């Protein structure tokens, strides 16, 4: 799910119109939520003690939400 975020963002840049762009960003956001879940599991189980990874995922999620809101307003 982590690598899918970047792949879907890249696809959004080459979307076939605004609706396709929004759809790709929505998929990226869903993948970001899934990645956040896995990072939380790794953190809680002790496999990943670095909060920076989770913080970066949360920050990326905020960027995607903001980008989606802007794209929907300009649709």
Regions found by a protein language model. Give the residues of each.
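Short, C-terminally biased terminal segments at protein or domain edges
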Residues: 1-7, 11-75
């Amino acid at each position: 799910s982590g690598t899918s975020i970047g792949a879907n963002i890249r696809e959004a840049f080459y979307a076939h119109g605004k609706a396709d762009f929004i759809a790709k960003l929505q998929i990226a956001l869903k993948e970001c939520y899934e990645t956040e879940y896995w990072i939380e599991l790794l953190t809680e189980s002790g496999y990943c003690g670095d909060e920076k990874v989770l913080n970066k995922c949360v920050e990326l999620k905020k960027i995607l939400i903001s980008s989606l809101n802007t794209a929907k307003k300009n649709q």
